[in-house]
Curated annotation (Swiss-Prot):
It comes from Shouchella clausii (strain KSM-K16). It catalyses: tRNA(Phe) + L-phenylalanine + ATP = L-phenylalanyl-tRNA(Phe) + AMP + diphosphate + H(+). Binds 2 magnesium ions per tetramer. One of its GO terms (biological process) is phenylalanyl-tRNA aminoacylation. Coiled coil: none annotated. This is Phenylalanine--tRNA ligase beta subunit.
């Protein structure tokens, strides 16, 4: 936001305060001033000149010899090459001895035999950016408007207000109230405790009513809470007076014509976007605001043909769009030199609708920037009256009485209770309620004492003030951050410790790293196709309202798709051994249309591909397989103290190998799975043989951990027995081990698998599983007979329950 120091003085008396002091004060109060720009880039001795005579140069086709009155006894002769120079003009003249930006000094000269005593200047030569110069003067000298009263010899630099400073404000998103001159004036009024002077808005209306010219309707009051149209007849379109042009250029806006310039001026003054339509070009007495139709065509003021969508809001003449609401007007209803009657639009559009509309159009304007952040809806009509007043003053318009209005605003006062004790405790002050009330009055926030609290009514212009803490900040800003007392923190020092969940998370990640895995971190947003890849049938992927791209349009429902991408990325770069884990959130919802927040679930995913362990110097390699992955899972459960509560049962899942997929159960409830990726999926994704695991971390951390029990080093020897059981292929090792443990009683210390065999010499549909069993008595030496008796009992029980046969 660019703020002219001279313009600012129209609203508040600050002539005794320098721009540098203002910048320092505002920066210290929370609104940063990035730069102070001086409009005069080094120009001196430039005056108003009257071109009395113009004659062609006798020896140069493109030069003219001008006799110019510059307020001295005699006219001066100046040779000028501008194509638009003509007698009867008032122009800016750099006298002999003057200096112009860039260190140029004007001297007496002789051009093709003709004396030249000065220079008729363009605005660019006075240091004004070409992008801000009115289009009619881009390629020539500047000519003062006929309506402007100037005299030869007047200081032209003062008329152009080049002896001005411009403050560049770096506003944070919450301070959109300072995106206009009055907002900055309110801020300074609070900082310096000075009154505000409001602009003139009283319009001379005629008896003729606007009702006979225009009527207004809106399709949706939420999209358009307020819309007002004024009608102004008999306007004379022409250039704006210099003071208006100067202020627009100081704010970084190019002057166009008096009516359009007024709308831009009020935008900068009130922060209220306005738009002027040519009444006759509207070709209708109706203005209707609605959503655009699918594929509806519309040409904006910049000449671009645009295809609209129902997400965009348009102003129509009842038939077709005449403006992209809150963003830009239409080419066919713009104000031109032929315009005589103007319809002045002043409206409040919903910020989100304008933001979406501007984004879809790829078009961001000064108007949309203000609508997006929210405008003061209570000042819309006042801003319209201000614009009507200015048009009446500088374009000779006749303002018809009344206005066409559609009003769906919901009016409510924002009253916040300020607890004085809490405020003083928070900001470290000891202010009385009277002192705080005085600060609120400086902000022009009405307030009253209710009990021990101060009830503050927040004006609509300050949309950033919504909670007591916002008022605390305002008090601290006005009181002065530098004045806040310095105090040391008070409190008892306590030894910090991790929560149980933090400790488990650290143990889990430490174990995974020790198992040789590397951590991966991927985006929580994915494509809709990947989000649906592993989602349960009841889970509906959640679409982001305004995604940056299709690849980041949906909240993920699984960690695996991105791990697949990472694995493929590594394989494509000849890194064939990929051992990864990722811990992150997934977002789950069963709603087709989201009305409640989705469930955010923390998960752990593991991906293994290639070689798990390699010792080249020994010639040893171990490729990843299902049992390596299951071993990592079992080690993790042991680390978390959950081994006895976990079961692994065969499972079938889409996208995974039907014979190498297991459901992971915690106390009978599924918390995830481990599996080999199906060969067809591996081929489609350019993966090698790949194994994955995905677990619900929330469920793991919520489970009751088994207590660690100390067991001393055994004092008595153990006896080991082996057994090889031939069972059906459907019988799992886990089932056999459960029977063995139950039948073994107290004497059985451990049981482990040391061999699984299928193939030659084995009956069809059968497999052999060999177990090693260790027996030990806790209080004495176990005899061989006791161990044999226990072993035979186990064999008998296994045979009874499963039909197993001892393998010879």
């Amino acid at each position: 936001m660019l703020v002219s120091y001279k313009w600012l003085q129209e609203y508040i008396e600050i002539g005794d305060i320098s721009p540098q002091e203002i910048a320092e004060k505002m920066t210290r109060s929370g609104i940063e001033i990035d730069f102070i720009h001086e409009r005069n880039k080094g120009a001196t001795n430039v005056v108003v000149g009257y071109v009395a005579e113009v004659a062609p140069h006798p020896d140069a086709d493109k030069l003219n010899v001008c006799q110019v009155d510059i307020g001295e006894e005699e006219r001066v002769q100046i040779v000028c090459g501008a194509p638009n120079v003509s007698s009867g003009q008032y122009v800016a003249v750099a006298k002999v001895g003057a200096r112009l930006p860039g260190g140029i000094k004007i001297k007496k000269a002789k051009l093709r035999g003709q004396h030249s005593n000065g220079m008729i200047c363009s605005l660019q030569e006075l240091g004004i950016d070409s992008k801000l110069v009115p289009k009619g003067y881009v390629d020539g000298i500047y000519v003062f408007p006929e309506t402007q009263s100037v005299e030869p010899g007047q200081d032209a630099l003062a008329i152009f207000e080049l002896n001005d400073s411009v403050l560049e404000l770096d506003l944070t998103p919450n301070r959109s109230d300072c995106m206009h001159m009055l907002g900055v004036a309110y801020e300074l009024a609070a900082l310096y405790d000075r009154p505000i002077k409001m602009p003139k808005t009283k319009v001379k209306e005629v008896i003729e009513s606007a009702d006979g010219y225009i009527n207004v309707s809106v399709e949706n009051g939420e999209d358009t809470p307020f819309y007002q149209a004024l009608v102004i007849k008999d306007v004379k379109i022409g250039p704006s007076p210099s003071w208006l042009q100067n202020r627009l250029m100081a704010a970084g806006i190019r002057p166009i014509s008096n009516v359009v310039d007024v709308t831009n001026y009020v935008l900068l003054e009130y922060g209220q976007p306005l738009h002027a339509f040519d009444y006759h070009a509207l070709a209708s007495k109706s203005i209707h605001v609605r959503r655009a139709k699918a594929e509806e065509a519309f040409t904006t003021l910049d000449g671009e043909k645009r295809t609209l969508s129902p997400e965009q809001l348009v102003v129509t003449n009842g038939r077709e769009p005449v403006a992209l609401a809150g963003v830009m007007g239409g080419l066919h209803s713009e104000v031109t030199a032929a315009t005589t009657t103007v319809v002045l639009e002043a409206a409040a559009f919903h910020p989100t609708v304008v933001r979406r509309s501007a984004r879809l159009a790829g078009l961001r304007s000064d108007s949309s920037a203000r609508f997006e952040k929210g405008i003061n809806q209570e000042r819309v009509s006042e801003a319209a009256r201000r614009a009507a007043y200015l048009i009446q003053e500088i374009a000779g318009g006749i303002v018809l009485s009344g206005a066409a209005i559609a009003d769906a605003r919901v009016r409510s006062e924002r009253v916040i209770a300020l607890d004085l004790d809490k405020m003083n405790e928070r900001i470290g002050t000891n202010l009385s309620i009277m002192e705080v009330a005085a600060l609120m009055r400086r902000l022009q926030f009405p307030c009253e004492k209710v009990g021990s609290d101060l009830h503050v009514t927040v004006p609509h212009r300050r949309g950033d003030i919504t909670i007591p803490e916002d008022l605390y900040e305002e008090v601290a800003r006005l009181y002065g951050y530098d004045e806040l007392p310095s105090t040391l923190p008070v409190g008892n020092t306590t030894q910090g410790k991790r929560t149980a969940e933090q400790a488990k998370r650290r143990k889990m990640e430490a174990y995974l790293r020790s198992a040789g895995l590397s951590e991966a971190i991927s985006y929580a947003l994915t494509s809709s196709e990947k989000a649906a890849l592993f989602a349960a049938e009841t889970i509906k992927p959640i679409q982001v309202a305004m995604p940056m791209s299709e690849e980041r349009s949906t909240m993920r429902t699984s960690l695996l798709p991105h791990l697949y991408d990472i694995c493929t990325y590594n394989l494509n770069r000849k890194n064939n051994d990929v051992l990864l884990y990722e811990r992150g959130s997934v977002f789950l919802s069963e709603q087709e249309t989201l009305t409640e927040l989705p469930t955010e679930q923390e998960r752990l995913a593991v991906l293994l591909s290639g070689t798990y362990m390699s010792h080249p110097w020994q010639g040893e390699k171990k490729a990843v397989d299902f049992y390596v992955l299951k071993g990592i899972a079992e080690g993790l459960m042991e680390t978390l103290g959950l081994s006895e509560q976990i079961e692994y049962k065969p499972d079938v899942r889409p996208g995974f190998h039907p014979g190498r997929t297991a459901n992971v159960l915690l106390k009978g409830e599924s918390i995830g799975f481990l599996a080999q990726v199906h060969p067809s999926t591996q081929k489609a994704l350019d993966l090698n043989e790949t194994y994955v695991l995905e677990l619900n971390v929330d469920a793991l951390f919520a489970a009751e951990t088994e207590a660690l029990i100390y067991r001393g080093i055994p004092r008595y020897p153990a006896i080991t027995r082996d057994m090889a059981l031939v069972v059906s292929k459907e019988t799992t090792a886990a089932e056999l081990m459960a029977i063995i443990r139950e039948a073994g009683g107290e004497l059985l210390e451990t049981v482990s698998i040391f061999d699984v065999y299928e193939g030659e010499h084995m009956e069809s549909g059968k497999k052999s599983i060999a177990f090693s069993l260790t027996y030990r008595h806790a209080e004495r030496t176990l005899t061989d007979e006791e161990a044999s008796l226990a072993h035979e009992g186990i064999v008998a029980e296994v045979q009874k329950q499963t039909g197993a046969v001892l393998r010879a």
